[in-house]
C-alpha cells in the first residue's frame, strides 16, 4: 500500500515498504522543500514525477551506482579529453545546467524536471548542497550535469549533451574530482547504457542503504569553485 506524505511531517516510510510494481515507488505527496529533499536523499529516495502528477518518491531495487575507483574511460574518450576540445567547470552556472537538463528531448515526451523542481534544486544549490558541472566549447555551454553532495556520497540527478560526448567528459571530470576528495559512491539512480559504459553497475537496495549508513556523515575534501 502506497504511503501518502503530509506537509507537516518529513518522515518517509522504511525503504522495504517500496512497491515492486512499479519498482521502487515508496511514497507520494508532500512537497519539495529543501528540508524534505535533504531528508529524502539521506533516507535513500528521490523525487521523480511528471508535471500534473503528485510528487512521487522512489527507491528502486536494484540501484545503479558508480564507485569512483571503478570508472571506465574508453580510449576514444580519453583521447578526446586530452585534446582539450571542451572546458569543464563546477558551479559556474547551475541554473543554466538544470534548465538544459529540463529541456525537451527528441526521445522523450515532456520532462520530469518541472519548474517547481528546478526552483527547489536551485535553492539547494544556494545552500551549498546541490552542485553543477558545466562543459563548454568556445565559451558555449554544450553539456553538463547536476546532483547533490552529502558526506562522501554524490547523488546524480540529470545530465545533458549538445555536442559529441560532452556529458561524458563532464561526468568523468566530476568522478575524478570526487575520487580525489574521498567520495565513496556516485548514485546514478536508474540504469542507462550511457552510464554502464562508464563503469556504473547495479547493487541491491540493502547494499545502497549500507553506503548511506557508513558514508553520509563522513567528511570529504571537495571544493566547488564558482
UniProtKB/Swiss-Prot annotation:
Q: Which reaction does it catalyse?
A: N-terminal L-lysyl-[protein] + L-leucyl-tRNA(Leu) = N-terminal L-leucyl-L-lysyl-[protein] + tRNA(Leu) + H(+); N-terminal L-arginyl-[protein] + L-leucyl-tRNA(Leu) = N-terminal L-leucyl-L-arginyl-[protein] + tRNA(Leu) + H(+); L-phenylalanyl-tRNA(Phe) + an N-terminal L-alpha-aminoacyl-[protein] = an N-terminal L-phenylalanyl-L-alpha-aminoacyl-[protein] + tRNA(Phe)
Q: Which residues form the signal peptide?
A: none
According to its UniProt record, where is this protein mainly located? cytoplasm
Task: Identify the keywords attached in UniProt to this record, alphabetized.
Answer: Acyltransferase, Cytoplasm, Transferase
Q: Where in the cell is it found?
A: Cytoplasm
A Gene Ontology biological process noted in the UniProt record is:
protein catabolic process
**One of this protein's Pfam families, by short name?**
Leu_Phe_trans
- The protein depicted here goes by the name Leucyl/phenylalanyl-tRNA--protein transferase
| Record organism | Pseudomonas putida (strain GB-1)
UniProt lineage = Bacteria, Pseudomonadati, Pseudomonadota, Gammaproteobacteria, Pseudomonadales
List the gene name.
aat
Amino acid at each position: 500500500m502506497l504511503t501518502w506524505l503530509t506537509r507537516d511531517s518529513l518522515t518517509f516510510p522504511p525503504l522495504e515498504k517500496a512497491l515492486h510494481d512499479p519498482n521502487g515507488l515508496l511514497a507520494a505527496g508532500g512537497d519539495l522543500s529543501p528540508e524534505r529533499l535533504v531528508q529524502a536523499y539521506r533516507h535513500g529516495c528521490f523525487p521523480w514525477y511528471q508535471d500534473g502528477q503528485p510528487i512521487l518518491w522512489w527507491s528502486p531495487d536494484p540501484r545503479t551506482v558508480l564507485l569512483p575507483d571503478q570508472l571506465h574511460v574508453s580510449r576514444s574518450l580519453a583521447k578526446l579529453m586530452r585534446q582539450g576540445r571542451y572546458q569543464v567547470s563546477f558551479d559556474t552556472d547551475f541554473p543554466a545546467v538544470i534548465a538544459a537538463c529540463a529541456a525537451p528531448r527528441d526521445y522523450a515526451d515532456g520532462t520530469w524536471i518541472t519548474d517547481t523542481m528546478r526552483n527547489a534544486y536551485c535553492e539547494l544549490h544556494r545552500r551549498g548542497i546541490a552542485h553543477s558541472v558545466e562543459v563548454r566549447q568556445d565559451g558555449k555551454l554544450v553539456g553538463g550535469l547536476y546532483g547533490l553532495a552529502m558526506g562522501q556520497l554524490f547523488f546524480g540527478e540529470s545530465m545533458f549533451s549538445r555536442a559529441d560526448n560532452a556529458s561524458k567528459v563532464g561526468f568523468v571530470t566530476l568522478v575524478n574530482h570526487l575520487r580525489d576528495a574521498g567520495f565513496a559512491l556516485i548514485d546514478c539512480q536508474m540504469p542507462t547504457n550511457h552510464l554502464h559504459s562508464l563503469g556504473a553497475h547495479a547493487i541491491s537496495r540493502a547494499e545502497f542503504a549500507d553506503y548511506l549508513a557508513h558514508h553520509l556523515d563522513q567528511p570529504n575534501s571537495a571544493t566547488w569553485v564558482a
